[in-house]
Structure formats: C-alpha cells, structure tokens
Amino acid sequence: DNGRSRGLGDVYKRQAENRESFANLLKDLNLLQPKNGLANSQLEALEISRQLGFPLLIRPSYVLGGRAMMVAETEEELQHFFEEALRVSPEHPVLLDEFVKDAVEVDVDLLADGENSELGGILEHIESAGVHSGDSACVFPPHSLSEKTLLELERQAKLLAKNLKVRGLMNIQFAVRDSEIFIIEANPRASRTVPFVSKSIG
C-alpha cells in the first residue's frame, strides 16, 4: 500500500540498507564484515584506501545488478573507478570494501515471520568472490562447503533475519574463506536466486 514494503518496518529497512547502521548491527551480533568505508570525494577514497589497503571493491550506492562495481588494485584504478561509481549514483557516497581474496561467495535465501525463519537454500557461486552475483553461475546444493560451515551460515542468516525483524523473503550474500565467514550484504526482499531455489527444492 502506498508503495511501502510489507515485509520490513521502515526502521529495520533503513538498518538493512544504511551501511553504518548495518555495520553496527553486525558488530553487536559478533558477525564479520569486510572492512569498509564511504567516500564522497576522491580525496576521501584515497584516505580510506590507505587504511584498508588494496585490492578494494568499489561500488556506487543504491544500484542493482552490480552496475559500475569494480575491483581496484592501484590508486590510479581507484580514481578511475571512483569517478564512474559517482557518475552512476551522484547523490550518494561511493562504497569501498576490503576485497576478500580466495573466498567462495554464497547466497542464502530465507523466509521469515519476524521472529523465526526457514532457509530455502544455500547457493555456492562457481566464480570466485568479486564477480557480481548477477554475472555468476551458482550451484545448489553447495559442493565445497563443509557441514560445519553450512550450519554456521544458517545460524548467521537466521540471527540476522530475527534482528532485522524480517517478515517475508530475505537474501544474504556471504564470502567464505577457510573458516571465516563475512557478510557482504543483506537484502530484505526476493532476490534473483529465489525462483531457482524454489524450483530446485520443489
């Protein structure tokens, strides 16, 4: 009604979509996230890069499909990619994330009622982390993750959904490197993987 999301209250929607609020929530829940920063200018971006190091994942705010998302290996690439990201979303800061090397990217889709949730599936990307999910093939069930890792992914996904008071579908993207699990982002809505998961599990 009136274009409002039925699955998530405004406060929790802002918490999921606002980078600073989301980072604070993950910290409170003892969940890992790649180190990151927000930059409104090239100078700020360079300062952040010197804190985080390279490579860095550069992406504009509030865009879909991985548009203008690039991995910068040098300050020169950072400056070029930053301008492109700012051009795509000029009203919002550019997101800079530590690039998690040698990681497996994972999508988790779940359905929640505000308190409890059920996982639809855990999908493992075939490409290495850093290729946007819209451009990446994935497999279900995951083929290289241990049972311990799968249980931990489920725990973290349900914990996050509960604390965001999600009512409806939610997609969470993870990067798994050895025994470390990083949360890349959480989207309290249906993702492109939902039809695939739905058909796979019947």
Residue positions per predicted region:
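A conserved helix-loop-beta module that forms one wall/lid of the active-site cleft
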Residues: 10-69
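ATP-dependent carboxylate activation and anion-phosphoryl transfer catalytic cores
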Residues: 6, 16, 29, 52-55, ...
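Generic structural marker for isolated residues within well-ordered, non-membrane alpha-helices
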Residues: 1, 23, 45, 157, ...
